[in-house]
Amino acid sequence: MSGLFLSKGLFPQEFFRPTVEFLLRAQQADGSIPWFDGGHCDPWDHVESAMGLSIGGEYGAAENAYRWLKNTQLEDGSWWAAYRAGEVDNRERRETNFVAYIATGIWHHYLITQNKTFLRE
């Protein structure tokens, strides 16, 4: 292999398009991306979905996904374990370990888009 697994242009966009289309259909108006229609959303898997949108060239949708995370982050820096239909779905625990993965997703988006304005947001 002569490049990173997901180096730009390594795979044709048609390869990813069905997944990207699924993510676009699943994404809610508030930017959250549940596991499936009517399912819950957890920040970890949500970031994976946002990364898929970035890879698929859907930068606006990916940025909306990251804005949802910004808007739902709790004062102590954590997130609830799960959300559903815009509400907290699991108040039994909060997750601080999501922070590193969310930062990774945002960095990934920046590496693809070079959008410094988004980083400053």
Go through each PLM region and give its residues.
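Low-complexity, Ser/Thr/Pro/Gly-enriched N-terminal "stalk/linker" regions
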Residues: 1-44, 55-68, 72-79
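Aromatic-rich carbohydrate-recognition surfaces in CAZymes
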Residues: 42-46, 53-62, 66-121
